[in-house]
Swiss-Prot record:
One biological process term in Gene Ontology: symbiont-mediated suppression of host type I interferon-mediated signaling pathway
Molecular-function annotations in GO: 3'-flap endonuclease activity; crossover junction DNA endonuclease activity; DNA binding
Protein family membership: Belongs to the asfivirus EP364R family.
Induction section of the entry: Expressed in the late phase of the viral replicative cycle.
Coiled coil: none
Pfam families attached to this UniProt entry: ERCC4
Enzyme Commission code: 3.1.4.-
Top-rank taxon: Viruses
Keyword Hydrolase carried by entry: yes
UniProt-listed InterPro entries: ERCC4_domain (IPR006166), Mus81 (IPR033309), Restrct_endonuc-II-like (IPR011335)
Organism listed in the record: African swine fever virus (isolate Pig/Kenya/KEN-50/1950)
Protein name per the record: ERCC4 domain-containing protein EP364R
Length: 366
């Protein structure tokens, strides 16, 4: 059985996709239904799959504006994750580039000449052997997706089945990216520079925040800097957004947890105290539970260079929650907090420029 998986953030295309597939369902000559699943994807925006977990194709969709922005801030190098996925699964890779056909080569799109975008697209095809398909708009992208899906469903494509799970780093990047304005690249730098506990406890001074740069050596956007400083001063709304990025913790649960106390209060408490927090539901009250409490403590103290505890002036390794032991471990180091923020900054910027390549731990969807 073949099925199409769409990333839940593709909300501009999904309505068209549902309509196009609905026409197929109503076609009397089409006996088999085409399932569409909307999930969280860590590589690409769409996956064409064959049951149970065979990936046939990975598709990334970008508008001209998105493509231009990715050239400037380093997200263009996300293609490395797609290349790694292809190496592991032998799937085909596609880039959908959305916008009016053949604009003037000198036309500026997001301050990038269209000629530069064409050059980047050519490199994707020639150097990386990635198919590039140009579409007019979201509706046209949906039509091309359905056509591509049918082309695969009519042919047997031999690939290696794979079961992919996210690494701790990817989950931590997702946590930081729950804040508005923080892209995957900026999230990666933050995940490898400091922990959330480090930030909310005020141990990342404003001057260190001001030094943060993207892989292209550009300063972080002012909005992001102001937001990080605001978190260090105890902004409740932003703390709720951060907490909601922890696996199995949504916005409603995060708001309930932080209803009476700041995030720093819970990070200073033993895990057992956090596990006993009473969560009000419609008809009853339940405890947060040890598994969620351990996940909160683990990911809010997670840093690519080390894990930080807010009740100490040294960085110490924290215990790994039993529920996450299946994922890859990260190295820990013992050094003063003021050193980690400077040294890890350079490491993280260099690392982000090369992007994550071990898709052996990426996820198909969760």
């Amino acid at each position: 059985m073949y099925f199409l998986v769409a990333d839940h953030r593709e909300h501009h295309v999904i309505p068209f996709l549902k309509t196009d597939l609905q026409h197929i369902y109503q076609n009397p000559t089409q006996k088999k239904q085409i399932p569409l699943e909307i999930k969280q994807l860590f590589t690409g925006d769409y996956l064409i799959c064959k049951s149970p977990s065979t990936i046939l194709a990975c598709i990334e969709r970008k508008t001209y504006k998105d493509f231009a922005a990715s050239l400037k801030d380093g997200r263009y190098k996300n293609r490395q994750k797609m290349l790694s996925l292809r190496e592991q699964t032998k799937c085909q890779l596609y880039f959908f580039v959305e916008g009016p056909a053949f604009p003037n080569p000198q036309k500026k799109i997001n301050h990038v000449a269209y000629a530069s975008i064409i050059t980047a697209m050519t490199h994707l095809m020639v150097r990386d052997h990635i198919f590039v398909i140009q579409t007019k708009n979201e509706a046209h992208s949906s039509q091309k997706l359905v056509q591509l899906f049918y082309a695969f469903s009519k042919e047997m494509v031999c690939v290696v089945p794979t079961s992919l799970t996210p690494t701790d780093e990817e989950l931590c990047i997702k946590l930081w990216s729950s804040l508005s304005g923080i892209s995957g690249v900026i999230g990666k730098i933050l995940a490898n520079t400091c922990s959330v506990a480090h930030l909310v406890s005020g141990q990342l001074p404003p001057q260190n925040i001001d030094q943060l740069k993207t892989p292209s050596n550009r300063p972080f956007p002012k909005k992001v800097k102001r937001m990080l400083i605001s978190i260090s001063k105890g902004n409740k709304e932003l703390e709720i957004k951060l907490l909601s990025g922890v696996p199995n913790i949504g916005k409603k649960l995060a708001a309930e947890i932080l209803k009476d106390h700041a995030l720093l209060f819970f990070l200073n408490q033993p895990v057992e105290c956090l596990a006993n927090i009473q969560i009000a539901q419609k008809t009853r009250t339940i405890k947060l539970g040890m598994k969620r409490a351990e996940a909160i403590h683990y990911f809010l103290n997670w840093c690519g260079s080390a894990r930080v505890t807010v009740d100490s002036q040294n960085i110490t390794e924290t215990s790994r929650p039993a529920t996450i032991q299946a994922t890859a471990t990260q190295p820990a180091a013992t050094q003063p907090l003021h050193e980690i923020s400077n040294e890890a900054l350079n490491e993280a910027s260099n690392d982000a420029s090369n992007e994550v390549t071990h898709t052996g731990h990426q996820t198909l969807f969760i």
